[in-house]
């Protein structure tokens, strides 16, 4: 049986980031996840020496710029003794949809033109990282400004856009069907 661990995340943050509180991992709010049962069963003689604990995450409203954790502690077992040095776990939440993942750097190739203040037009090309926001949405940094530093929220908020991908291929061009895209400010 597992239960939430109220101290583990604070210990983790202090050990890994000390006074750099901007980098601290955040405790995922219980309103953002469901654990139907905090009990799991390991099969006797099974090939895999572990058991899975299903956790359902509701990602809507979570920021890809934050590190979210669910701290858990093993509190009881039926047949064995618990090792007090190995009875805690930090479950890291990784946002992912069909278009982007926090785990892997999902890149989009960008080509276009940019008009500078004096009217001069120049060509631009870059690979842009996409961040998952919801089932059908990703965030992309627009233009050539660099918001690669996740901690630079001012740049992220100023230069990012949200791309919403339609659920069905409703656009056709030259016999090929495409998902419609809606683009709006972040």
PLM features per residue range, with description:
Residues 1-41, 50-186:
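Intrinsically disordered, low-complexity regulatory regions in eukaryotic proteins
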């Amino acid at each position: 049986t597992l239960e939430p661990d109220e101290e583990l995340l604070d210990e983790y943050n202090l050990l890994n980031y000390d006074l750099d509180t901007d980098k601290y991992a955040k405790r995922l709010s219980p309103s953002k996840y469901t654990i139907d049962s905090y009990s799991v069963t390991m099969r006797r003689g099974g090939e895999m020496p572990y058991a899975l604990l299903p956790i359902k995450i509701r990602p809507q409203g979570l920021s890809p710029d934050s590190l979210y954790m669910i701290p858990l502690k093993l509190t009881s077992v039926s047949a064995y003794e618990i090792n007090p040095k190995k009875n805690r776990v930090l479950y890291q939440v990784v946002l992912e949809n069909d278009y982007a993942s926090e785990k892997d750097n999902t890149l989009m190739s960008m080509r276009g033109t940019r008009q500078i203040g004096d009217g001069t037009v120049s060509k631009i090309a870059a690979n842009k990282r996409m961040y998952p926001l919801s089932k059908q949405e990703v965030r992309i940094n627009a233009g050539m400004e660099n918001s690669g530093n996740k901690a630079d929220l001012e740049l992220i908020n100023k230069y990012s856009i949200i791309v919403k991908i339609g659920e069905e291929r409703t656009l056709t061009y030259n016999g090929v069907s495409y998902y419609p895209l809606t683009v709006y400010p972040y």
